[in-house]
């Protein structure tokens, strides 16, 4: 069941960082938050797999779920999040913002941004309601394209366990533009509405 979360912004557009698959790595989160602050983002959208590294992955560099929780809790009022396949009620107990919804919708100045992890909804199985941009993660492989119905589809990749030979990545949404960048600040792709 989707949570519909609407931000009413009255002509003031927000800048969002969209981040998925941290998997408990404190150094990976710190690098991403350096980009968050450096680019002037105002809201952090977490697409799940926040604290737990998952049994299929090796141990991430700097595994520190409590440190990740502490860093995120300090900015809880600026975070919206959805549940990943590695997130549980135990993880929720450590975090001071909700993470247990499978998806949520942000409406920013009329633009519909769907956030989901990717294990329930993704580019092949979209949520029932339409969106201008669909953000997801889960596969750790970034992608950015416009599909046949004009929806921008963005897999943010992962700052911790990038796959396919990719660098650690995240996404930024700002005033109709989606950008994929590395945690070192290199822009890999952009797409405009």
Located regions from the model:
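Core catalytic region of metal-dependent phosphoesterases/phosphodiesterases
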Residues: 15-108
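Conserved beta-sheet core of the metallophosphoesterase superfamily
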Residues: 101, 109-114, 119-190
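Intrinsically disordered, low-complexity N-terminal regions enriched in serine/proline/glycine
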Residues: 3-4, 35, 172
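Anion-binding (especially nucleotide phosphate/pyrophosphate-binding) glycine-rich loop
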Residues: 193
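Intrinsic low-complexity/disordered segments
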Residues: 1-3, 20, 114, 135
């Amino acid at each position: 069941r989707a949570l519909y979360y609407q931000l009413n912004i009255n002509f003031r557009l927000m800048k969002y960082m969209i981040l998925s698959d941290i998997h408990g790595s404190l150094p990976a989160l710190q690098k991403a938050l350096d980009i968050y602050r450096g680019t002037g983002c105002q809201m952090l959208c977490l697409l799940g797999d926040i604290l737990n590294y998952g049994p299929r992955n090796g141990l991430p560099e700097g595994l520190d779920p409590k440190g990740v929780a502490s860093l995120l809790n300090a900015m809880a009022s600026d975070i919206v999040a959805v549940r990943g396949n590695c997130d549980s009620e135990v993880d929720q107990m450590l975090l001071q913002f909700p993470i247990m919804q499978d998806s949520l919708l942000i409406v920013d100045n009329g633009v519909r941004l769907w956030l989901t992890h990717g294990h329930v909804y993704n580019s092949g199985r979209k949520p029932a309601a339409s969106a201008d941009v669909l953000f997801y993660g889960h596969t750790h492989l970034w992608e950015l394209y416009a599909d046949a119905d004009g929806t921008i589809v963005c897999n943010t990749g992962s700052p911790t366990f990038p796959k396919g030979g990719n660098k650690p990545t995240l996404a930024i949404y700002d005033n109709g533009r989606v950008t994929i960048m590395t945690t070192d600040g290199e822009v890999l792709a952009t797409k405009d509405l």
